[in-house]
């Protein structure tokens, strides 16, 4: 049973941490997603049973229904962990969506990559296109059908300021293959070595960070879609990518809200 990690809640918004492996919102009723978990939480808090556990993909109240209102403002890929904000009223959803469209959100990520980038700090700007059939994206030319601009800024994280500090993937420096494992124990400190990057998104394309970092030879540790070292891996891997910091203005009070994680929520 997944327990919600709620960072902040009031009558208008709810801010929580999405763990690795749980979808933000899914059409499947087989596994829980963040929307169903939060709706169950809201239903229990209000003392109503509602339909929060069964109707997971609905983000608006059905007339005559007791299901709590919840609007998805932004999403994280299912393998990725991090901070999400949800709206509990239509007015809050409208304001937050407007902020998101006008780049009013500060979305910051941490990624543990296999190789250090050529420059410790920089901007990546590419055109990307999504392949719905394979649920992947790739770098493309501006003329390709469906191409969209993708831009991010990255900076190498200094020593002792890491987010990824669990023993199995503690970064001890740059190595050629951060996915290599020792023969005696894959869980010992230092097995996964790499470079930790802080990333600030200007755009929010499908798999953007994963694709753009892989395109410069810096795939993310644990990324079975875009890390060549894991291309034949069939077992579940925990991707070392976390939306660790989020800034926005409260939709009602307009106060600047700041949330930050100190460690990756495994």
Predicted regions and their residues:
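RNA pseudouridine synthases
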Residues: 1-266
């Amino acid at each position: 049973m997944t327990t919600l990690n709620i960072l902040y809640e009031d009558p208008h918004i709810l801010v929580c941490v999405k763990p690795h492996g749980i979808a933000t919102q899914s059409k499947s009723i087989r596994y829980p997603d963040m929307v169903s978990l939060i709706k169950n939480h809201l239903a229990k808090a209000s003392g109503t049973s509602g339909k929060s556990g069964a109707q997971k993909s609905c983000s608006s109240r059905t007339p005559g229904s007791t299901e709590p209102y919840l609007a998805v403002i932004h999403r994280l890929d299912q393998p990725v962990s991090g901070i999400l904000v949800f709206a509990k009223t239509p007015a809050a959803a409208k304001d937050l969506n407007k902020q998101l469209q006008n780049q009013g959100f500060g979305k910051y990520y941490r990624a543990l990559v296999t190789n250090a980038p050529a420059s410790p700090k920089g901007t990546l700007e590419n055109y990307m296109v999504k392949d719905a059939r394979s649920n992947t994206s790739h770098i493309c030319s501006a003329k390709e059908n469906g191409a969209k601009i993708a831009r991010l800024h990255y900076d190498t994280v200094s020593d002792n300021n890491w987010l990824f500090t669990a023993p199995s993937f503690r970064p001890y420096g740059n190595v050629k293959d951060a996915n290599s494992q020792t023969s005696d124990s894959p869980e010992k400190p230092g097995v996964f070595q790499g470079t930790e990057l802080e990333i600030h998104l200007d755009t929010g394309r499908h798999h953007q960070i994963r694709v753009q970092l892989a395109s410069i030879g810096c795939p993310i540790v644990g990324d079975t879609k875009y890390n060549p070292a894991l291309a034949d891996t069939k077992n579940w891997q925990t991707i070392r990518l976390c939306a660790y910091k989020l800034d926005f203005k409260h939709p009602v009070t307009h106060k600047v809200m700041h949330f930050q994680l100190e460690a990756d929520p495994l």
